[in-house]
């Protein structure tokens, strides 16, 4: 029997990124970028995918995100969570991507988007992967964001509140609502 807790356990967990890695990257150490990438790619992929709902768009946004991290490491001042800085860069590139796409959407792109839905290739269990892919379709964008920030990035509620600019009650209720929707969805599939 599969439950929401088992599915969430399959999400990639974010590893902490020390400020020193970003400072080292700012000084030209390209090995630091490789380490940042390795520690953040799975959680960041899942988060951006929760926003775009399209693996191709997600890959484009992530490429721009990591280039920006390399180019702007010197502007990072530390003191905050490094992953919050990285997630904010990814969110900004996602928003820019949506603006660009809105201006040039075509029938071909819409067909491509339908074919390229969620891809949870990082989830090893094939049954869990298929359930996650279908379950994500039932959540609203903000519910997906909150779920991923909590379950994948391991953020505390107050960190999610600060990041999204929402109040605590909204974050808590949307998280609970997303869990309930997933539980109901899984009940239908079993």
Q: What residue spans do the PLM features occupy?
A:
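Structural recognition of an alpha-helix C-terminal capping motif at a helix-to-coil junction
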Residues: 46, 60-67, 80-92
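Short, charged helix-capping/linker segments at alpha-helix termini
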Residues: 8-9, 26-35, 45-64, 168, ...
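DNA-recognition helix of helix-turn-helix
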Residues: 95, 143, 152, 157-189
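Sigma70-family region 2
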Residues: 26-27, 53, 64-81, 100-101
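Intrinsic, short, N-terminal disordered tails of RNA polymerase sigma-factor systems
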Residues: 1-23, 35, 133-141, 162, ...
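Short helix-capping/turn signature of helix-turn-helix
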Residues: 39-42, 50-53, 148-155
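Arg/Lys-rich amphipathic alpha helix in sigma70-family domain 2
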Residues: 71-78, 88-108
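Internal acidic/polar
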Residues: 2-5, 14-15, 96, 103-129, ...
